[in-house]
Amino acid sequence: MIKINIQKQLHGSHGDMDLDVNVEIKEGELLALSGESGSGKTTLLRILAGLESAKGTIKVDDEFWLNKKTSLPPQQRKIGYVFQDYALFDNMSVEQNLLFVKDDKELSDKLLEITELTELRKRMPSTLSGGQKQRVSLCRAMMNKPKLLLMDEPLSALDSKMRKKLQNEILALHNEFGTTTIMVSHEPSEIYHLASRVIILNQGIIVNDGTPKDVLLCTNGSQKFSFEGELLEIVEVDIILVAIISIGQQLVEVVVSESEAKNLIVGQKVNVSTKAFAPTIG
């Protein structure tokens, strides 16, 4: 069990705000952390890793990582950290990057096998693709068998095909080792696929906490589905009006009435929902 109760004043793009997080994470849980940019997600991960100071307490099992009397340095926290930028040693091979963390050839071989990197063990990082580098980074983070694995948008720089592959490998590693994991992500499909729980941060505080289905699937009453998107344009096609809306990485077209169109402004956030298979915009 990990118990987090921390406070820290932040100076973000929207002005000063207080990061105030009080949450418990069960052992073996894979938790997704989401929310707008500047809401405190990365700062929370850095505090957990001991890379930034904060007030409050962090208790992992029976050990305090942070309280009034102590703040354990990063190397004593048994943390695995996966960044967006890989952070590999360029002068070491794939295998050497792993063994540098811990001289455990058996564990290294197992991690490379799970992530399908065995044939690349002697390769240097400069010869690898972005997806391969991130898989090496993930394996290296697991070499010390961390009590807590932190991943800060680890798949954000990858294309959709490689993202899907790494999602499956993250799940395979999690199923194999059962490591408690906190992953920052903005992708609903990624969160739904990987996480057992999702927390939404807004201006430094938790505004939603639950299963991915409960938090991300915005349904209401008899609605079949509801998605938030950005209105890009309203165009006239023959005798009907069509709204062009960006939802995630896709564009959708929704027929709107004249009265609906009068109340819509290009650039605004809208909800696209359906009742009895008839999409509506709100």
Regions found by a protein language model. Give the residues of each.
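Catalytic Walker B motif of ABC-type/P-loop ATPase nucleotide-binding domains
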Residues: 149-153
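A short, proline-enriched helix->beta-strand linker immediately N-terminal to the Walker B motif
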Residues: 143-147
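Conserved ABC ATPase signature
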Residues: 124-128, 132-134
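Conserved ABC ATPase "signature" region
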Residues: 63-67, 105-122, 126, 171-172
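ABC ATPase NBD coupling module
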Residues: 65-81
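ABC ATPase "signature
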Residues: 209-210
